[in-house]
């Protein structure tokens, strides 16, 4: 049964979905003996989850479960696998679920690097053709209202990944569309022609970038993400910023100014009008669903 979770675990983890999976295991005394239906699920899922652990002592159960939910929800959300041997499941105890938890070596970043954000603002002030590229990190941080206000304050058009859709209303005049192979002509052309690409909460996977060497070649790239490992992994950026999306956006709201980019916005609106996504006249299409 545990192996049936593998695809779901990988998908949820790649999409930064907080998920705790409890799996059954043979008794601790039989682990490593090739017992009936014994599978090293921790080993199988370690590379596709945020954390995976086998509980080998009843005394560790309550604390491990508390840690599992804490790790899954904090920092960059992800999947935690808790493997429970049969004897641990059947054990009795009176342990209390700890209210506070400290995990050595795990300290999610929640600060805002003001120096890097000021550098990003300086680049924005001189931009003629800027765009925001918004990923799921903004939705995870519940920063939708703040993101909409930032777009309206600066006047910068907003492009989203599929996971970032909803970061601002899709009916908003500054919303361009989705990027990448599932995206619109206007969004992809805007990325190709922008001079500043301000990305928040994305990981620049291949569904977005296509050929990396041809992605936003004329742009200075600013990237905000809570996960340092996601920055400059696929696309080398000019201004890396490790920060919580909502805190960073709130800082930008205090410092940002309206930009004089009406010619650029008009060009994007022209592309949206000339090359709309054709939904067809009957039935559902993939474009309509997305």
Regions found by a protein language model. Name each.
Residues 26-47, 170-175, 232, 236:
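Active-site-proximal loop->helix
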Residues 2, 26-31, 89, 164-169, ...:
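Short gly/pro/ser/thr-enriched loop/turn and capping motifs at secondary-structure boundaries
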Residues 136-222:
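Glycine-rich, anion-gripping cofactor-binding loops and their flanking helix/strand elements
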Residues 37-40, 71, 98-100, 150, ...:
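Short, hinge-like loop/turn segments at secondary-structure boundaries
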Residues 6-7, 12-23, 46-99, 120-123, ...:
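Structural signature of the thiamine diphosphate
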Residues 59, 95, 122, 218-290:
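Phosphate/pyrophosphate-binding active-site segments
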Residues 59, 84-173, 265-290:
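Cofactor-pocket helix-loop regions in the catalytic cores of large enzyme subunits
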Residues 24, 57, 84, 135-136, ...:
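Cofactor-binding loop segments of dinucleotide-utilizing enzymes, especially the Rossmann-like FAD-
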